[in-house]
Structures are given as C-alpha cells and as structure tokens.
Design a protein with these regions (language model features):
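Dinucleotide-binding Rossmann-like beta1-alpha1 core, especially the glycine-rich loop
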Residues: 123-197
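Active-site/ligand-binding neighborhood in enzyme catalytic cores
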Residues: 20, 31, 204-309, 313-317, ...
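N-terminal secretory signal peptides
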Residues: 1-46, 69
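Core beta-strand elements of the Rossmann-like FAD/NAD(P) dinucleotide-binding domain
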Residues: 324-332
Length: 524
C-alpha cells in the first residue's frame, strides 16, 4: 500500500477508516464513538505505522536480469552515476564507505536535485523548503542520514503545537470538521471497502490484475459510486496535491490502494490510525543532507555534464555521451535522474527490454508547485490554528516556518498545488491566494510583507516534474518496473522505490540499496 505525503489526504484517510469503524460499531451512538476514537488517537500518537513490504525483494529478485558482462580480475570496474540528487549521492556515499571508486555526472551546477532550502527568502532568520519538505517517523533512511551527518531535527508535533487546531477545511464557503467528513463518508464506506477487498494482492506490469480499476480515473470511480458534493471536491483536491496530476487522469487504483482501510490483507495488521505523519524537518533546511553528502563526495562529482546518449557496445559496458564534453566508458552504470529527464536521452543503442523502455517513456510525473509568501506574524495561530488550510483552489496550505524562531515574528506560508493549477502557478497569482488565505484567517492579508517566491518544478529544466504519479493504465502497464536493474544498469531515485515512491526517503533508500547490490557484485 502506498503512503500519503499530503496533510489533507492523511486526514481523509483517517476519517474514512473511522467511518468504516463507526459502521461496524452500530451499538454505540455515532457521537460517542467518534469521541472515543479521538481520545484513542491522542493516546496512540507514538504508535505510528512502521510498514515494510518484505515481499518486494522477493518479487523483484526473480525478474532481475542477471549480469551479462564481467570485467577483468586485475582491475576494478569503472562505475558511473548520473544525477547528483539524493539518490545518486547516497549511492556514492555508500560506495565510498566500501572503498569503491566511482564518478557522479550532474547536468546542472549544483547537487541536491529536488531538495532546495533557502534561507531568508520570506523572513529574517527563517529557512524555506522550495522542494521536499516533510520527513515521516518511519523514513528511516532520512533519520539515519541526519544522525550520521550530525543534523538536528524539528518536530512539528511538539507539545506546543498540539494545543492548536491543525486542520481547517474550507469548502463551499463553509468550515467543515473531521467529524462531518466522517459522517459524509458513511454511505460510501462499505462500497469502497468492497472494491478494495476485490483487488489482487499483486498489481504491477508482471501481474496486470484489476485492469478495470486501473483504466478508470479517480473522477470516474467517484462518479461510479455516486460520491459527489463537497466531499468529492475534497477528495479530488487531496489526490491532485498528493500525486501532482489532476484526478481525471490518475488511475483509480491510486485512490483504492492509498485509501485502504484493511491493511491486514497485505501487511498482516489492521491500522485504523496508520498514517503518514509528516512530523520532522531538518533544522536549517532539509537540503543540508544532500549538501553535506556532496561535500564528502566533492572529488567524485563532475558538474555541467548533461547526458545525451547511452550506448551499449557488443564488447560490454556502456558508453556515455555528454553535451559538449568527451564521452566516457563505464562497466557499471547507475541512472539516478528522473524519467522526465532520462526520456530525453538517446537510448536506441542501449540493450534494455521493452517493459523498461515503456516505463522510462511513459511514467507519469506530477506538476506540483509552491507559491510562498511572507507575513509579519502568524495570524492563524492567534486564531487557534496551526495554519493548515484545505480549499477547492488550495490543495494544501501551511505555515512553512512553523516552530522557527519560537513561532514569533516574521514567517512564511506555502500554497501547494498540483495538476494544471500547479503547472501554471506563477508569482502573478499571489493576490488571488492572499485573498483565499484572508477568507480562512481574517486579518492575514494586511500582514503580508511583500516577499513572494515561486518554485514550479514542472518548469525546472533539470526536473520537468515534481515526483512520479501513475496515470490510468500505468499500474498494470508499467507499474513498479522503474527500479528493476538490467544487467549492470541500475536505477535510483524516488521513482525507483516501491514503498516510498515520491518521497525523499525513497531516493535515499534506493541509492543505498543500489550501492549494496554493486558492492556485492564487485566484491564477489
């Protein structure tokens, strides 16, 4: 089961699970049941889900194409890593610790990929995450790297924050409570659960089961079950922000898998309160992790190296051609760049199977963007809110400077959009979103300090998208083929992860696991 990365979707997941539980506890009045569950939720904050997909290794191991080209015993293989984002850097980091040489080729003039922390962008003494922002409790790769690099973490679930209301749902010009969301789910809970339970245990390109759901969009599914009104709008907003593409093009399996109320079918336990908690940030900026890795690996990185072609000669190995630079040869190749960029590389002379070509060519990518604005103070906190806002035109809004400077003085606020809204978001939209924030938290607009920044990852020439997203037909057409190696060709990055696809943790995880595979191969 995939994990949520957005606050709204996490809240909706929990509301749906509580609606199912309420229907199964008909002997308890609804209000009394909800109150009891809210109490349990508070008492169980430290028992968040630690899911792992143990079957993943076994499922992929059987279809990994074995190495077809060795190298001479009297020399170490030449290893090339393309991409100096977190996946490529963590791969290099583990290779270096194992005493194995390599070179990282990066198209831009910076490391870090889609992680970018900017100091003082919106307010003095603050930092703002222009890219990957939140770290879950079970993002073990990120926690381990932070510990290894002596970086401290900010806990946004600190005691001071629990005293305020976290979420403000603002739809149809009304404020909705979580209790109302649960009530709205009740008529549809059993139907959604039945559809989820009808899903096969394995759905991917090797096991193209449940094509009917895969070929149906989320919009089509909601219409099919008769779910309309403000709850349908809220769900569409949640999934557009979550995956980064409009729900009219997303596979309904994105909805059915992520909203599963019965994780026991695949993970041997029922988790009513299991969720992505988005609890941590690195103090001073998340990009300190890849920045520090880049400093450790500085003698291994070559910048301004845009890959334009990969060839695989009959004699073995790989030939990499770069724009305006000499070609290089490698025995082992790690591609740690998003498929949005890899599909621009000439691969006709690379010996890879058709399923891998389809994955590279067609995998969907979100168009998430952030509009970030500065304010003189946190008006939302004075009104009893942490600042999280959900609105038909705001897929998620939040205080991006939460807990910085003890929540005092100037601050920043992020508007997060996906789909066509994210694709087209620009600084000229600031006035529109200032008015929306004002409608939710009156008095905020007058406190705007006129500092505004934009990060549109779909328009960034080195990413051309935010993170991976399966569109209709892609679960069964190319699903989970991204990270499978082909001979001595490996893939790393968030898109190559199964459990943590779309997360920083997925990039770090795949970088490490690819390095471990190479280490075993080299030292065998």
């Amino acid at each position: 089961m995939k994990k949520s990365r957005s606050f709204l979707l996490t809240s909706l997941q929990q509301a749906f699970r509580m609606a199912l539980a309420a229907k199964e506890n008909t002997n308890i009045p609804f209000d009394e049941f909800i109150e009891s569950q809210e109490y349990q939720a508070l008492s169980r904050r430290n028992f968040l889900r630690q899911t792992t997909q143990a079957v993943t290794a076994g499922a992929t191991a059987s279809i990994i194409i074995p190495s077809i080209q060795g190298w001479a015993q009297n020399r170490m293989p030449k290893i090339a890593i393309v991409g100096a984002g977190l996946g490529g850097l963590n791969c290099g980091h583990h290779l270096k610790k194992a005493g194995i040489n390599f070179t990282i080729y990066e198209a831009s003039r910076r490391t870090n990929g889609r992680m970018m922390s900017v100091k003082g962008a919106l307010a003095g003494g603050t930092w703002t995450e222009f890219g990957g922002e939140f770290i879950d409790t079970d993002h073990t790769e990120m926690h381990q790297l932070a510990k290894e690099l002596n970086l401290l973490k900010l806990d946004v679930d600190a005691e001071s924050e629990r005293k305020l209301t976290k979420d403000l749902f603002f739809f149809d010009n009304k404020h909705y409570t979580v209790k109302q969301v649960i009530q709205e789910f009740l008529p549809f809970a059993n139907k959604i659960k039945a559809d989820q339970e009808s899903l096969s245990d394995e759905i991917d390109y090797l096991h193209p089961n449940n094509k009917d759901f895969d070929n149906l969009s989320i919009d089509g599914y909601l219409e099919k079950i008769g779910l309309t009104g403000w709850l349908a709008t809220m769900l569409k907003v949640a999934f557009t922000g979550e995956y980064g593409l409009d729900t009219g093009v997303q596979s309904s399996l994105n909805f059915l898998e992520l909203f599963s109320p019965d994780t026991g079918k695949r993970h041997n336990k029922f988790e009513l309160f299991g969720k992505s908690d988005e609890r941590y940030k690195i103090i001073g900026g998340n990009d300190q992790i890849p920045t520090k890795l880049g400093e450790i690996l500085k003698d291994h990185i070559v910048f301004d190296s845009k890959l334009v072609e990969i060839q695989e000669p009959k004699a073995g190995g790989y030939i990499l051609k770069f724009d305006g630079k000499p070609e290089i040869k490698a025995d082992i190749l790690v591609l740690a760049l998003p498929f949005t960029m890899l599909r621009e590389v000439q691969l006709k002379k690379l010996n890879i199977p058709e399923w891998k070509r389809r994955s590279i060519a067609y995998m969907g990518y979100g168009t998430n963007s952030k509009l970030m604005m500065g304010f003189q103070r946190r008006q939302w906190r004075s009104q009893g809110y942490l600042g999280f806002l959900y609105h038909p035109e705001v897929h998620t809004g939040w205080d991006n400077s939460q807990l910085q400077n003890n929540n005092e003085g100037e601050c920043g606020y992020s508007i997060f959009l996906g789909g066509e809204g994210g694709k087209n978001l620009g600084l000229n939209d600031a006035e529109k979103y200032l008015n929306i924030i004002e409608s939710a938290f009156p008095g905020t607009k007058a406190l705007h300090n006129n500092k505004r920044r934009i990060m549109n990852w779909a328009q960034n020439p080195f990413s051309k998208g935010s993170y991976s997203c399966y569109t209709t037909g892609q679960w069964t057409g190319i699903g989970f083929a991204e990270g499978i190696p082909v001979g001595n060709l490996y893939f790393a990055g968030e898109h190559a992860s199964i459990e943590f696809q779309g997360f920083m943790n997925g990039a770090a995880q795949t970088g490490r696991t690819v390095a471990e595979e190479i280490i075993k191969k080299v030292k065998a």
